Amino acid sequence: MSARQSPASRAPRIYAHAATSIDLESYRAYKGPRLPYQAERALLLAQPGDLVCVDEPVDPSFLEFLSRLGLGPLPEHLVVGDRCASGDFVLAEKLRHDDATLLSMAASLPKHRVVYLDPFIGTSYEEQLVRALQTRCGVQVIMDAPRAAIVERYNRKHEVRQLAAALGLPIADGEVVALDGPPDHTPRDITPLESAIERALSKTAHVIVRACESAGGSGTFLVDRNTGSLESTLAEVAKRRDNRFYLVEERVAASVSPNVMLHIPLPPEPIRCIGVTDQVLDEGLVHKGNRFPTTTRCADAIERDALRLGRVMRDEGYRGFAGIDFIECEPPRSSRSQHLFIELNPRVNGAFYPLSTRARLNEMQDRRGQPTINAFVSRSLPTQPISFEALAASTRDLLFDPERGSGVLPYKTGGFEFGFVTAISLAASPEEAERLLLAFASRLPARRALE
């Protein structure tokens, strides 16, 4: 089987990994103009026969680069949403409202076979797209994600925290705060949140406040005693219209923050752990990348807790991917758990793309008798705006080479024009992966030091 062939038994997939489906005002503002380009990530997942839907055209030179590695869809299977549609439309809406695009998608899919819609997150937008493909195009489509109502339930961090505690998963000390006010309006009074933070600060010097419906770090606030961070946090919360519940917890010092990626299928198939990675977080605890393999000493316990949560989710009708965050606590904690459950993302997350890319590449490496990829580190790197062609020209000797079984694979190329290069460094060892990424970062135009 060549690198560009797909197993005949594999059902075709329609990838629609647009983060615009996350309908949170603060998240959209946080991501800014880069948000429509997030759907590009699914190019790493697609195989021949799959469709990849994006909001914006993709650089042809990047598609060619992926093709040489045996990754990505066929060029004719890249579906660009209607660029004349309202800017308020999410990708799934653009596709659903464009009959020509729907019919073109249907024509690219095999007849009389089930097709899976693989979204970034399952929402009502994706559910409506499935119905449109079924009723208007006659395509047998199943959404490989939980129903929107189930996603909404598991997006509420305070409810998931309560579930985790009921299952016996270790959680940080803290409380849930409810703010008064009508939906989609700023809170009437933030005094309850202020009081909760002050109570927490009377017991510990470091507190974390998290909006209970948030994504990508857009709702995370760090409050330290005697720094003015309490006032700035309250001022920011007072402006927000998309949350009424906040978690106020002790900010426990962590040696590492592992993420467990699960796939939860319908029974009787077993729940699978796709992989455990260490999150790369900035000083504000915002996700910037992932490392594999994990360095946590608690890997077995963390995976066991994740699977326990996954089984309950499946019993409640959950089907699809889920990312579960933990921290490994810095010692000494002799009388307490060495790890804590932090939160659940009822969708794929940033770790999924490098994990899947490593698995795909290793399948091809194995068939060709080439070196196995044992480690990776992914990172979002600040730079000056740059094109993919210019980036490839300046880093060609560092890009992934199947013969070596190592190198750097840039992706999410739409973000390059905004001064962010996202890349996966793959290698035989974690040390080599870090070395390659540092070398790659040093060639970026801004030449900023990589932390």
Question: What do the PLM-derived regions correspond to, one by one?
Answer:
Residues R41, P57-H185:
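Conserved N-proximal alpha/beta basic substrate-recognition cap immediately N-terminal to
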Residues Y30-P48:
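Short catalytic helix/loop segments, enriched in acidic residues and glycine
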Residues R136, V151-F245, T295-R304:
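Active-site nucleotide/adenylate-binding loops and adjacent lid/helix of ATP-dependent enzymes
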Residues E363-E451:
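Peripheral (often C-terminal) accessory segments that flank ATP-dependent C-N-forming ligase machineries
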Residues T204-H206, V223-L281, E328-F341:
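Phosphate-binding site of ATP-dependent enzymes
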Residues L45-D59:
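Short internal beta-strands
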Residues R241-F245, E250-R251, I274, G284-R336, ...:
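A long amphipathic alpha-helix within ATP-dependent nucleotide-binding catalytic cores
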Residues D282-E283, F341-L355:
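Glycine-rich phosphate/pyrophosphate-binding beta-alpha loops
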